[in-house]
């Protein structure tokens, strides 16, 4: 279990309430993850985000928990919190372009085009031969940055 002061810092950055950052025990992690995933799958993104936030505060080094939180926040249109969470995912999984791509989507939703372009370029650099992702990156660049 991580220190409560650190939990509070993470919660503040993500804009979480005290209820969302109540600690859980290690034996609660697996069922809580299944419940969070179920909420996400059913479209209840706010409930999913609340549970993923508790999981993140229990194990801040879990890429799965941060990805779940980032995805839930993004789908709930809490784009700033999603950007912060995608940033942590990119630190924990540094060679994965997906977190950069999703951060770019959030930045575009926040009308932060300069930051979005940086994130798209980072995703492009890491995408390798992932044709589907390359197409998505180029589509966003064409839509948002093409000079007409």
Where are these regions (language model features)?
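TPR/TPR-like (Sel1-like) alpha-helical repeat modules
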Residues: 108-131, 138-142
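Long, contiguous interaction/recruitment modules in multidomain scaffold/adaptor proteins
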Residues: 1-28
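Alpha-helical adaptor scaffolds
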Residues: 26-98
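Ankyrin-repeat and related helical/solenoid repeat scaffolds used for protein-protein interactions
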Residues: 87-118
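Register position in tetratricopeptide repeats
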Residues: 41, 75, 109, 142-147
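Structural signature of alpha-solenoid helical repeat scaffolds
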Residues: 23-24, 57, 91, 125, ...
């Amino acid at each position: 279990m991580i220190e409560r002061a650190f939990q509070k810092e993470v919660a503040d950055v993500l804009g979480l309430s005290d209820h969302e950052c109540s600690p859980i025990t290690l034996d609660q992690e697996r069922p809580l993850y299944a419940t969070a995933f179920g909420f996400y799958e059913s479209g209840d993104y706010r409930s999913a985000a609340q549970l993923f936030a508790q999981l993140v505060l229990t194990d801040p080094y879990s890429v799965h928990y941060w990805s779940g939180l980032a995805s839930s926040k993004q789908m709930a249109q809490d784009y700033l919190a999603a950007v912060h969470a995608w940033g942590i995912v990119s630190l924990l999984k540094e060679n994965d372009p997906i977190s950069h791509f999703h951060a770019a989507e959030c930045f575009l939703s926040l009308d932060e085009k300069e930051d979005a372009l940086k994130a798209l370029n980072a995703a492009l650099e890491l995408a390798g031969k992932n044709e589907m992702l390359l197409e998505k990156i180029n589509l966003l660049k064409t839509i948002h940055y093409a000079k007409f």
